Amino acid sequence: MTNAISITETPNELTTEIDLASPVEIVRLLRQCDAQIYNGWKSEPGLNDQEILERLTRLVEVVTHALKSRGRQRVVISGAGTSGRLAMFTARAFNRLLATRNEPQIFRYLMAGGKAALIKAQEGAEDNPHQGVSDLKTILSDIREGIYIGVTCGFSAPYIAGQLDWALTQPKMMSVLLGFNPVSLARQRPIENWDKTFLEVARAVESSPRGLVLNPLIGPEPITGSTRMKGGSATKWILEAAFAVAFARAFPMTRRSKGCLLGPLRGEKNTDTLRRLLWQYEIAREQTYQQRDAIAQLIVWGGDALLSRRSICYLGRDSFGLLGLIDASECPPTFGATFEDVRGFIEGGWPALLEDDEDLSSHGPQYRIRLTDFGKNTLPSVKSPDLIVGILEDGRGPEVLRLLKDSAAQGARTALLTYERPSGFAAKKSNTLVVTPHLEIHSLIPGVPSYAEFSTKLILNALTTGAHILAGKVYSNRMIDLRLSNSKLYYRILGILRILMGVDEPTADKCVRKSLFDTDSLTEAQSSARISALVERGASAEKLVPKALLLATGQFSHAQACEALRREPIVRKILETHLPKS
């Protein structure tokens, strides 16, 4: 591997002009990029390669043993951002499955920043390895035997590095690192207030007899560094496939249920079973993108909403409503979206989400996520060109359907994403749309509709990514209005300035700091402020990257950059005038 840039931070050569593409072309480009999840990238080992499948089989074996332990072992999945949300999503699904058999619910999840981070990014949370260790020790306070799975797509999150480092010291724990870079490209930069780099920890996992690195190379993201897309999808594939096979081994099935792929395994090898399950995700991808024109229409409507400073709202139930919440939560750090730009609401609110008595609604408006909250607080002001999207696997959900009808009556555009013929909702007017992907198989095993969920994730990611492209938040295939919420994004911002403006890293750093501190002349304290201090200030910074880009041209003072962006809020348009010509 000669490329010194992390694969997850490398621009995808397929999408270098995605910002100039029509909505239909955007969907085609996303379809091509997503094909790399299964088919692989260049000559690197991919998800369908034997060596990766054999490593994944090792995970199946230890999870099978944990499931058979009758509660004496734990499986802990941990991540930051999208990885943490998918950790929760997966643990929730398989604990529900265990509950149907009256088996101990052994799956646990951890997320940098805690439960509040499921909805809103918590600044700097993933940069603290010590907090990661503390959280892991707490969740394993009564049982220190089992499997720890740390998910970090780019092999970069200090929160995960700390947990892996500690887990390796536990004699009865298996430590698994899941991501999509070669170990050699794990982050080597120093971690604040810690004595190791992520690269050192990754190598320790790789060399440990109780360690396992799962890192199929799935290629760069369609939008550079946006690992919520391919990285998130591949994470879902890997965890669900491994856990489903382990479940089938621990609790043998006597028959295959209707609409499910997995049945009695009998003499089938785990590698063959995994290959079959993963292939079905690829089939689901193909069948989802057959809805190209409908997805493109969603992108058009989403772009109209954002350009008019209106909203995209998701209304759903069960795991499909949760996917809407996850997609919405990813937009502020990725695109600099405001709280109101993209919202998610779920039937039952926090109790349905967490399945415990904790309700975070009192934390503030962003955490009021019930459908009744939408009806009470959002619906009264809904109008054209707001886009309200219902997400119902079976097309049934009286409260969601009623809110869609009420929204349409007030002039909003409405859409229903479903996998069955909808009951009580039809696209009879020009402002309504039904998207119905025709999937061959919906579920891995009963109660885990993995393939329909993956299809939903693809469509929601395409909608919000495409809408933000139309709203001018992407230049070439790079985010140009992301928020500075952790050290990973700080280094990504420096990379954006270096590549787009042709400046060196010290100059890029100086422009970011000037933008962040609202000044043309940095003080000594501002020049030497640690990254953690920049992240803390970056939580409330508006147009941080666009201002830094304009400052890097040498043609703007800070005040002039602010005025230029005030006159033209679509970031891409103003940058077109001032970025260096290639």
Show the residue positions of the predicted features.
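Conserved N-terminal alpha-helical segment that immediately precedes and caps sugar-phosphate-binding
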Residues: 1-582
